[in-house]
Amino acid sequence: MKIGVYAGSFDPITKGHQDIIERALKIVDKLIVVVMNNPTKNYWFNLDERKNLISKIFEGSDSIKVDEHAGLLVDFMAKNSCNILIKGLRDVKDFSEEMTYSFANKKLSNGEVDTIFIPTSEKYTYVSSTFVKELAFYNQSLTGYVDDKVIVDILNRAKEYRG
């Protein structure tokens, strides 16, 4: 069984992330979506909330597991016997950054981790979690940018931020 890992902060998960997850399942048999905390980011949703948003979207899927990890991703992958890392790419900037990480992950894992890059579908190239949060903050429609199952959660959080 081929098990892949798709990691990110997912604050919140977008249709772009969802598209990468669904397309990754054409490559691997099982995908572990790993929610990570980046110490340089300020989050709208805490770790458990982000995991719950993802779980809500993929509820009932036997092919997707949602997990969390603090630390090096290669350590999580070794612990879970995974060697396929899935990365979505929106543009050349993403490619440049992720290519560097792929070399580092390969070295840190003693050659065990291979990174598979999946280009973002054209309709999601400009969609990011930051973009979604900005739309939500200004009470704009999130339809088409996030799954319908999580729109209310995101709009409610935006309302809290607006005060």
Swiss-Prot record:
Disulfide bond sites: none
GO biological-process terms attached to the record: coenzyme A biosynthetic process
EC code: 2.7.7.3
Location relative to the cell: Cytoplasm
Cofactor(s) recorded in Swiss-Prot or TrEMBL: Mg(2+)
Site features described as Transition state stabilizer, chain residue numbers: H17
Main location (coarse class): cytoplasm
PANTHER family (UniProt xref): PHOSPHOPANTETHEINE ADENYLYLTRANSFERASE
Function text: Reversibly transfers an adenylyl group from ATP to 4'-phosphopantetheine, yielding dephospho-CoA (dPCoA) and pyrophosphate.
Protein name in UniProt: Phosphopantetheine adenylyltransferase
Lineage of producing organism: Bacteria, Fusobacteriati, Fusobacteriota, Fusobacteriia, Fusobacteriales
